[in-house]
């Protein structure tokens, strides 16, 4: 049979045991021995569950105390000086967690800010960015991989250690201090890979998996050349090497990847099925080919019959050189569907989490040589039934939604008048001062708010009691905003647990799991909603809350919604229709809410698109299509209102230059953005492009409890006014205030309002 393996398995545990142990350790409630014991138990359980599912070659090194890239940084001794404790022989778990979370001023190292965290390719997982210096030295400093190999082998498992490849590791990092080329570090780093491979060989390992996902990116020629050089140098080291690529197709890097002097290549045939024939044609006859046929980053069952066609063909071509795997590490999948005892039976039958995906991989591998095995035939029959159910289910396919999609006209995604005409009407109707002040939407989520929501869900509060509790919070938020002198108010979002989940719970076509947790970073786990069918809004979602808030004040109240692209990006999407179609369905549902808010007397509606840039494909040549449908989806949800109704959007990225034209194409009347940490430098993109609409650059960082002074905010606003005409500037924080406490929130907003008034004085004096 073909060999069944996985590239990695979720590390958090079926019941998020790792999260609970991490947080107990950080609070001092669990000692290091206790934390390490939890890690051992989880690793043993995860290896065994994969083995029981039919996986023959088990990954080791996919477990991490916080993040796999951070683990590699410790392994290679890439530890910034601020985290080095004087007198310690080497890094400890305290070092690791300090790099991830920062170190307080009273620790042994003194205060040290955490390393930067960013998205792992185009997933919703985040990694800790390695910090390199021009004189960076590498040395083996962390024994975790070798200890875990011994651990797994002692349990009788056949193992495949997992390493992030040298080129990908350098690509993921950033240079600190004097400018230098990270590739200059390669010759210093490669000897460590040699040491690691030799030590693993000494432990009895036969195969090692070397992850090089940057091979699916647009690589500069220097990096392509470096691949050949690096793997030529590693060729002489012991062990068979499987280079793993995922999250996309190799495209122009296909020849490079196929000809690397290694023993096998893993390719993602979920994201890029079209690369399969070319790989088989280009790969040397001695190499193993690992086919990623089961989606490692979604929750749907594999169409086994369709996948088996590829397996049969590959078996004929490759014989014993065929391996079968998920498309990528199962880190991005929830752990075990069996925990979901509350899910509707039909819906549950369509799903597969990590454990179930392992079984699918094993069935496909066995089917390569034993197509008539009872287990294979039963699995194929079950898969056919699932695919037939999904193809015909009226729960998925809704004629009314499809008819509405088909009826969309180009004019539906355009405001009635150009911005210049709209803004004149809006200014006349809203009658706001120069430098109008507002917030991004949410106010502090106190323990009393969370308790009220929890009690309502558990049936301990009646609906009337819950509504009154939320009304009380809204009254409090409105009263404080009026006292502070803000110009455009918000209701505070007390009723919302999450900016996606709140809306998804009220839309047809979404379902929620109880245990579908995936790791976002460290101990933070998220439970994305699942889009299973055509999406529609059965009733208004926010109107009553906003209408109540508006009834409390004569000032302008802003409605708050989450945009279609963000809803899509932070959910598990369908696989049977495109992301573009799902975004349009969401846009129509949100459009109805925007229109209803306008009818309720709400004159400003904010539609947040926090994930707009996150949706960009990994390859630049795919950007135009994505940006076209993503901007159209925003305009579709925002364009059903009169010119007098002002549409805001909020984005929180650190880079706008390469998408500024698309942001302008969204045609929001006002965009609020995160700029305080860049000292307003991000506004350069809007200045150079001559962005035509109004802008609210964030004037203070909400991620810090620190209260900015009036003088600081004034300085930032004056800097902004040198780039953007004063009449087009709004004044607001960087982001929502959900995670802050009320005292610091009020203190910061007092200074923000005072700063805006000072700028108005400047303007009046000319």
From Swiss-Prot:
Disulfide bonds: none annotated. Binds 1 zinc ion per subunit. Its cofactor is Zn(2+). It catalyses: 5-methyltetrahydropteroyltri-L-glutamate + L-homocysteine = tetrahydropteroyltri-L-glutamate + L-methionine. GO terms for biological process: methionine biosynthetic process; methylation. Zn(2+) binds at residues 650, 652, 674, 735. HAMAP family: Meth_synth. This is 5-methyltetrahydropteroyltriglutamate--homocysteine methyltransferase. It comes from Pseudomonas aeruginosa (strain LESB58). The lineage of its organism: Bacteria, Pseudomonadati, Pseudomonadota, Gammaproteobacteria, Pseudomonadales. The gene is metE.
């Amino acid at each position: 049979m073909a060999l069944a393996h996985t590239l990695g398995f979720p590390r958090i545990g079926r019941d998020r045991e790792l999260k609970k142990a991490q947080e107990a350790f950080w609070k001092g409630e669990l000692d290091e021995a206790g934390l390490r014991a939890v890690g051992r138990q989880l690793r043993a359980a995860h290896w065994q569950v994969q083995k029981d599912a039919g996986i023959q070659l088990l990954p080791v090194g996919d477990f991490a105390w916080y993040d796999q890239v951070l683990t590699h940084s410790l392994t290679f001794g890439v530890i910034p000086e601020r985290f080095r404790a004087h007198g310690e022989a080497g890094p400890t778990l305290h070092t690791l967690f300090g790099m991830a979370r920062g170190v307080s001023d009273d620790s042994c190292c003194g205060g040290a800010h955490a390393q930067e965290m960013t998205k792992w390719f185009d997933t919703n997982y985040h990694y800790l960015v390695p910090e390199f210096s021009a004189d960076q030295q590498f040395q083996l400093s962390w024994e975790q991989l070798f200890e875990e190999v011994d651990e797994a082998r002692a349990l009788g498992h056949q193992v495949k250690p997992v390493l992030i490849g040298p080129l990908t590791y350098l690509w993921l990092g950033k240079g600190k201090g004097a400018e230098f080329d990270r590739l200059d570090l390669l010759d210093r780093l490669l000897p460590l890979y040699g040491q690691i491979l030799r030590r693993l060989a000494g432990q009895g390992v036969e195969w090692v998996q070397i992850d090089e996902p940057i091979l699916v990116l647009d690589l500069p020629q220097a990096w392509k050349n470096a691949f050949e050089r690096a793997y030529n140098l590693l060729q002489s080291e012991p062990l068979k090497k499987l280079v793993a690529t995922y999250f996309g197709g190799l495209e122009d890097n296909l020849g490079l990847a196929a000809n690397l002097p290694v023993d096998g290549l893993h390719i993602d045939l979920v994201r890029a099925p079209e690369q399969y024939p070319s790989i088989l044609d280009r790969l040397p006859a001695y190499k193993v080919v690992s086919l990623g046929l089961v989606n490692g980053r979604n929750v749907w069952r594999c169409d086994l019959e369709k996948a088996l066609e590829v397996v049969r063909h590959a078996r004929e071509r490759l014989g014993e050189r065929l391996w079968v795997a998920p498309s990528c590490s199962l880190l991005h999948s929830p752990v075990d569907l069996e925990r979901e005892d509350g899910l509707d039976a039909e819906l549950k039958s369509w799903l597969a989490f990590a454990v179930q995906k392992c079984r699918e991989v094993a069935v496909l591998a066995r089917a390569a040589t034993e197509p008539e095995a009872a287990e294979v035939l039963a699995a194929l029959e079950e898969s056919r039934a699932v695919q037939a159910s999904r193809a015909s289910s009226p729960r998925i396919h809704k004629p009314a939604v499809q008819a509405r999609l088909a009826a969309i006209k180009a004019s539906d995604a355009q405001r009635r008048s150009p911005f210049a005409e709209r803004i004149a009407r809006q200014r006349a109707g809203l009658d706001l001062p120069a430098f109008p002040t507002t917030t991004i939407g949410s106010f502090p989520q106190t323990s009393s708010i969370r308790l009220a929501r929890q009690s309502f869900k558990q049936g301990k509060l009646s609906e009337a009691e819950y509504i009154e509790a939320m009304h009380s919070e809204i009254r409090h938020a409105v009263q404080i905003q009026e006292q502070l002198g803000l110009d455009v108010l918000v209701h505070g979002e007390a009723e919302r647990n999450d900016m996606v989940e709140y809306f998804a719970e009220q839309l047809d076509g979404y379902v929620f799991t109880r245990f579908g947790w995936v790791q976002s970073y460290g101990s933070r786990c998220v439970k994305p909603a699942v889009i299973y069918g055509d999406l529609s809004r059965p009733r208004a979602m926010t109107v009553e809350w906003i209408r109540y808030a508006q009834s409390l004040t004569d000032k302008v109240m802003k409605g708050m919604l989450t945009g279609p692209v963000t809803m899509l990006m932070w959910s598990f999407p369908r696989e049977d229709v495109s992301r573009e179609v799902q975004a349009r369905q969401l846009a129509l549902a949100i459009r109805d809410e925007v229109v209803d808010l306008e009818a309720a007397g709400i004159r400003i509606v904010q539609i947040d698109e926090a994930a707009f840039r996150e949706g960009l494909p990994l390859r630049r040549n795919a950007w135009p299509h994505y940006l076209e449908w993503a901007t159209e989806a925003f305009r579709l949800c925002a364009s059903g209102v009169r010119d007098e109704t002002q549409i805001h959007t909020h984005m929180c990225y650190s880079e706008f230059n390469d998408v500024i034209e698309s942001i302008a194409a969204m045609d929001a009347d006002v965009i609020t953005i995160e700029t305080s940490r860049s000292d307003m430098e991000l506004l350069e993109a809007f200045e150079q492009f001559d962005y035509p609409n109004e802008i609210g650059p964030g004037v203070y960082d909400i991620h810090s409890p620190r209260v900015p002074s009036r003088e600081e905010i004034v300085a930032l606003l004056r800097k902004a006014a040198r780039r953007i005409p004063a009449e087009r500037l709004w004044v607001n924080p960087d982001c929502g205030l959900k995670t802050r406490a009320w005292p610091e929130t009020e203190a910061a907003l007092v200074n923000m309002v005072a700063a805006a008034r000072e700028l108005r004085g400047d303007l009046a004096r000319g």
